[in-house]
């Protein structure tokens, strides 16, 4: 079974969920959205993110693939009504940036769950953020374990390749250590840079720095100025690997001194 053989459900229509919906619909695939608020549902339809949308989890009954485009805290504490609505025969995958706790939570909750993570994004969020071709040429990694359904894994690979992504698999622990280095730590370091510049005690120097800041500072600090809740969730859910990465970065700074 491939992605084009039935209906794809997307839970959450922010940047990642909305972008997946746009790309799948462009391929003629039926997309069923599930969101919390009716206002979000209305805007999702206006933007063409989905074929149909609802605030009722029962809408997922028709879906052969369900994509959990949810924040990490929501993935780790799924709603009971939502869990009951997931079809047992459907393939279920997530898009969270931390894999060990998500895999641990979900592998016992659904027999066809595949932990995955598309490595793509922008600084935008919410129902207005979805865009075409977000995943083109970007990595998409799955972290199966010994009990992961191989046919379900193949469906998620088909999804990733349809969206133009480069497909990878790794152990969940390896994924979390790698993204701590190249994704999670940069967010924290960038936020620290913004704070250091903003906390300059001399008001004249601080004002001059703000006036002179240009593309170099913008590029270096961009990821640190994003959604603070997202950064906190990434760091707290991947704490051990992030601390290890920060220790390595601290050592590098000490060598510069």
Question: Which ranges hold each PLM region?
Answer:
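Glycine-rich, N-terminal phosphate-binding loop of Rossmann-like dinucleotide-binding domains
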Residues: 69-71, 96, 144, 192
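Rossmann-like NAD(P)-binding element
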Residues: 57-86, 90-93
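Interdomain hinge/lid region at the active-site interface
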Residues: 205-257
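Rossmann-like NAD(P)(H) cofactor-binding subdomain of soluble oxidoreductases
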Residues: 78-128
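NAD(P)+-binding Rossmann beta1-loop-alpha1 motif at the extreme N-terminus of oxidoreductases
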Residues: 1-57, 61, 65
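Phosphate-coordination loops involved in phosphoryl transfer and adenosine-cofactor binding
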Residues: 4-7, 89, 137
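Internal alpha-helical scaffold of NAD(P)-dependent oxidoreductase catalytic cores
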Residues: 134-223
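Short, structured coil segments at secondary-structure junctions
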Residues: 47-49, 109, 136, 163
């Amino acid at each position: 079974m491939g992605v084009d053989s039935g209906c794809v459900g997307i839970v959450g229509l922010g940047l990642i969920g909305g972008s997946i919906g746009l790309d799948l619909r462009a391929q003629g695939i039926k997309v069923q959205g599930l969101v919390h608020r009716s206002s979000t549902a209305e805007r999702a339809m206006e933007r063409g993110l989905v074929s149909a949308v609802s605030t009722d989890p029962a809408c997922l009954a028709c879906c052969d693939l369900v994509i959990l485009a949810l924040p990490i805290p929501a993935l780790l504490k799924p709603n009971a009504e939502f869990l009951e609505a997931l079809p047992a025969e459907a393939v279920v995958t997530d898009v969270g940036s931390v894999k060990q706790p998500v895999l641990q939570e979900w592998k016992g909750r659904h027999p066809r769950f595949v932990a995955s993570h598309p490595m793509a994004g922008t600084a935008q969020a919410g129902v207005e953020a979805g865009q075409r071709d977000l995943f083109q040429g970007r990595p998409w990694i799955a972290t199966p374990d010994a009990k992961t359904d191989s046919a379900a894994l193949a469906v998620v690979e088909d999804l990733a390749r349809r969206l133009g992504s480069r497909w990878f698999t790794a152990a969940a622990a390896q994924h979390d250590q790698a993204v701590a280095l190249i994704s999670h730590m940069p967010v924290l370091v960038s936020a620290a840079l913004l704070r250091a510049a903003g906390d300059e005690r001399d008001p004249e120097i601080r004002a001059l720095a703000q006036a002179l800041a240009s593309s170099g500072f913008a590029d270096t600090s961009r990821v640190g100025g994003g959604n603070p809740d997202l950064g906190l969730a990434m760091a707290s859910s991947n704490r051990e690997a992030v601390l290890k990465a920060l220790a390595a970065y601290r050592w590098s700074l000490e060598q510069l001194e």
